[in-house]
Amino acid sequence: MIYNESLPDNLPSLCSKALLADVPCDRLVRDLRPDFFYRPASLERMCTSGCAAALSSWTSSVRSACGKNVSVPTDFDLLASPVVIPATLEHTFEFTCLRENNKFCGPVAALAAVFTDPGVSPFNYLSEAPEGTTDPGRCDSCIAARLRMRAGSPYFDGPIVASESLYQRLTSSCGITGKPVTTTTIDYSISEPEPTEDSCDGTQYTIQNTDDCYSISKAQGVATAWLLADNGLAAYCADFPTSGSLCIANKCDTVTVGVNQTCIAIANSAGITVTQLKAWNQVINPVCSNIGMMNGTTLCISPPGPRLPLPGTTDIPPLVPTTAAPVPTDAAAGSNKPCSRWYNVEAGDYCNLVILKFAISLDDFLFLNPGINANCTNLYAKESYCVHPVGDINTYAGRPGHVSITIDPNATFTGIPFTMLPNATVKGYSRPYTPAPLAKGVREDCVHYFKGDDYQFPPDQLGYWKSNCELAARNYGADNDNFVAWNALGTNVTDPSCSFVPGGRYCGSWNSQVVRTITETEPATATTGDGGPTPPAPTHSGQPQDCDTWHVVSSGDSCQSVADDAGISRDQFHDWNPAVGRDCSTNFWLGQAYCVGVSEDMGDMSTVASSTTSSVTPGPSKPEPPGPTHTGQPSDCDEWDVVETGDTCGSLAESNDISLSQFFDWNPAVSRDCVANFWIGQAYCIGVSS
């Protein structure tokens, strides 16, 4: 199963021999993976009782031969008993060959995966459900058995499955009883890494009787979070020691956080940016929503850590000489320009050799020594030539950078003083139209915007999509979570109640993304008759006579992508195009027209619902909340505020002149620490009529 070169050299010979023993199993067993679905034929071939017995015997012999005092390195620098090697493979074999009701469970899980997430997967031999099969469902005995085995295993993702009680939740919801989890453990070695001596890069401080976490951080000039992190202490000063010493390493200029202070207020008062504040205090989360839990602690308002010393002076001469060298008595004729270095030519020298020796170009060498001809045939031995200019050679007379200016200090200035010049003016660009205002909470820096009026389709016209929000997100190719955040929707895009307010603009893409149109433009060649538009390209037989929407296949299309683009299901596509094989491998051709809508099912998809107006009789009424709300808010609430990025419970109460207690009384769903149910885009009550 394993090779000699893969084992450590320091293993005892008996242990190595046991590990290298032959195990009579199919060759597929050696490379088994727990995250792979194997075909039934492969399972029949390798899942034999003989192989199971051989693996069990191999594990037992390795445990006996290697003992408890031998270890091999594993992940995360842990040392484990060598028995982990055969035991891991034995577990993978048992998981792969798991059976329920005399059937392999792997193919059942593969079929369930196809129904849950259809498409080609590198871990799945199925790309779509075979015809005539049904979804096994999450309560299938095989699905439960596989989850039960994972929950009791110490290998792979077993500890995660156990910690999240996934199997217990499944058995509870599916009514499965009498099948508890059986837990196994890994044979880890008792040897542990040698502890490293703690070192402090700063100064040691001895804790006094009157000290606490907050007083030490203030007195020592260190942020509270840095003090805790540098000493391996619990967050929020929990279980802070009352004796011993502390390492004070990351000193900085500090400020104490006040009640209900915000990141913006702290940064402004310190003369720094919010970005700097978060960079120097990594305990602050990206949106500063946890600053309200830090009152009384100290934060850094300058870079933490030791200051680098200022650079000192150096005696190294400048790279470019700034003073001329004395002119030698044997200087060549014409070599009379300022020169920082001279070279006395020796017999056998020639121009190319000299310029290579002193890293100077031939043009510069001839410029500094004009007595040499263009062919460089009159370079004389025993004479000195200039091989380096003083400063930049381009500032010499006759070079491109040379400027000669003569200034008369007694001349009278005749121009217009700079202070008397008129201020520059810029004429703004006039837009040919006035864009609609941004809807409440929508980002102001998006690349593409759209009007809420464009997505007011009734449910029967949405087709595949669950809401107008999901339709817009798909048209702009946006991730669901990002789309919700850009537009402060307050609910998932797949929620049928998710919608846009007419008259406002919404963010379609924050970065450059390809915008897909809502409806396809009909080809110019299509004509309308009694049976619907004439197909714009050749068609197959069997397509419905009342088809009124067509799609011509282009490069990159698939049955699924055509159905998705048209807002129909895959089954509808195949029902309306029966010539196409269910796996899309036959009769799906480039340039061919396929039916994606019929008159009795689709309706007029090109019609965009226009905003309607209705008259309302004036009368006393309370204001409608400007965003989604929580339960428990008072019925007589007449003032609302929608949470934006950077808001806290304290800042919301302060900006609306109410107390924090009033805020929590009127919004009982929000936890008192402002952690639970305080959401961006949600409306909260900040005033009542009574």
Swiss-Prot record:
Cross-referenced CDD domains, in alphabetical order?
LysM
Q: A Pfam family this protein belongs to? A: LysM
InterPro entries named among the record's database cross-references: LysM1-like, LysM_dom, LysM_dom_sf
**Carbohydrate-modified residues:** N4, N69, N260, N295, N375, N410, N423, N492
Task: Tell me the SUPFAM superfamilies matching this sequence.
Answer: LysM domain
State the residue spans of region: Disordered: 523-546, 606-636
What the entry lists under SMART domains is as follows: LysM (SM00257)
Protein name per Swiss-Prot or TrEMBL: Secreted LysM effector Vd5LysM
Tell me the name of the encoding gene.
Vd5LysM
